[in-house]
């Protein structure tokens, strides 16, 4: 395929992670070094920034600050949860995107996000093809939920898993201080897939983690849960996914309001407090509910070096493949074992195979009682959390990237 000259846009979407900026760095640095990419723009707040023509000129940034993106949590360019309509029903947004693309001669579009973001990528790519505008569109994976279909794992997951396991090991120490015993229930993110909550098993592997783990891959039964807790003696720690549900599909923690996000997902929360109140009422024991909430997705101080390196690799691969003539793909990971050691390589998946699909924990990795995970899961996740990054510090506090965010004219 002939060389395509033009500008590129990198956008970030959905929930932040501790390494999404590392992927952005991979895209930005590789694009700046590319001979056929004329300008590199960062979209303010994802696709909304494109629609509003608010694009940052990334060539104006200090290279040292760009380098710090690898160690900066959250979404440095700004994120959004904006659901684009089907272009066959309403193409207003798509016409506007085309207008902005033409204004800045954008020929490469990279979107860094999860399931919904890949759907956005797919829709934009198909529309550009329909109207005959040549633009190569690539998805860069991101989600702590680890539920993107077709990839071994997702950037962001390993660091969150490491944070969860470490935090629960620390909570375990606190929960076992008193001789009176305590039941501690920890709520962890995960709507339909329990990859994050299952990571708590890493703490248990080293003797300081939850006794019971409940995932959304199986139905939750309150009576069985209470019976499981009763069986534990002394102090008991429980890890639960926010998305655990009853047999009828209703979420245990679903908010009593009708609030949803931009993609129609129900707002969940308060599960730990709910279960804690029920257990306290039934047992009379001392019970504490803990919700890790946003901390699990922005804990860059506990990031996995492996995760950071792979996040950069994903961004770099997206640009290299697009420049080589590839479009309509998402960068994905596949693992290999070389001389007994874990190795991660990139592959490409069609956006149509990824958009709006979810990958869940294999049921055979969950124990027969549905309150824990097996060794297969430990073997899967342990290589991903390895390595301690040398985090930049200033007065013993983290030194994060400070971007100038100069708007393109």
Give the ranges of each region predicted by the language model.
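Accessory alpha-helical/coil subdomains and C-terminal extensions
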Residues: 100, 108-113, 119-134, 138, ...
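Short, ordered loop/turn segments at secondary-structure junctions
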Residues: 13-15, 43-48, 81-82, 114-115, ...
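Glycine-rich oxoanion-binding loops at beta->alpha junctions
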Residues: 1-2, 52-107, 116-117, 155-156, ...
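N-terminal phosphate-binding or glycine-rich loops at protein starts, especially the Walker A/P-loop
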Residues: 2-54
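Short glycine/serine/threonine-rich phosphate/pyrophosphate-binding segments
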Residues: 17-27, 50-51, 93-95, 115-123, ...
């Amino acid at each position: 395929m002939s060389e395509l000259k033009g500008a590129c846009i990198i956008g970030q979407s959905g929930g932040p992670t501790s390494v999404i900026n590392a992927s952005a760095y991979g895209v930005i640095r590789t694009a700046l070094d590319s001979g056929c990419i004329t300008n590199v723009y960062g979209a303010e707040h994802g696709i909304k920034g494109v629609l509003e023509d608010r694009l940052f000129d990334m060539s104006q940034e200090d290279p040292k600050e760009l380098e710090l993106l690898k160690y900066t949590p959250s979404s440095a360019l700004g994120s959004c949860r904006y659901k684009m309509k089907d272009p066959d029903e309403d193409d207003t947004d798509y016409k506007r995107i085309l207008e902005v693309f033409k204004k800045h001669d954008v020929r490469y579009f990279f979107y860094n996000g999860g399931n919904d973001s890949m759907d956005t990528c797919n829709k934009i790519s198909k529309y550009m093809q329909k109207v005959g505008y040549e633009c190569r569109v690539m998805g860069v994976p991101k989600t702590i939920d680890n539920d993107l279909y077709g990839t071994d794992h997702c950037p962001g997951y390993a660091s969150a898993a490491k944070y969860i396991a470490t935090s629960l090991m620390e909570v375990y120490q606190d929960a076992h201080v008193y001789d009176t015993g305590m039941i501690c229930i920890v709520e962890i993110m995960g709507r339909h897939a329990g990859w994050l909550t299952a990571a708590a098993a890493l703490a248990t592997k080293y003797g300081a983690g939850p006794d019971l783990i409940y995932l959304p891959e199986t139905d939750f039964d309150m009576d069985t849960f209470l019976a499981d807790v009763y069986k534990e003696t002394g102090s008991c720690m429980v890890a639960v996914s926010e998305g655990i549900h009853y047999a009828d599909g209703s979420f245990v923690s679903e908010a009593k309001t009708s609030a949803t996000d931009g993609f129609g997902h129900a707002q969940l929360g308060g599960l730990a407090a709910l279960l804690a109140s029920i257990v306290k009422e039934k047992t009379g024991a001392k019970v504490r509910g803990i919700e890790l909430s946003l901390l699990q997705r922005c804990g860059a101080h506990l990031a996995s070096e492996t995760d950071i390196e792979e996040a950069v690799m994903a961004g770099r691969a997206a640009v290299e493949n697009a420049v080589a003539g590839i479009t309509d793909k998402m960068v994905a990971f596949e693992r290999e074992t070389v001389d007994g050691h874990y190795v991660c390589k990139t592959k490409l998946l069609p956006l149509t195979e990824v958009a709006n699909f979810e990958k869940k924990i294999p049921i055979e990795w969950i124990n027969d009682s549905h309150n824990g995970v097996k060794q297969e899961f430990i073997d899967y996740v342990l290589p991903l959390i390895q390595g301690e990054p040398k985090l930049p510090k200033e007065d013993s506090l983290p030194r994060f990237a400070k971007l100038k965010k100069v708007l393109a004219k």
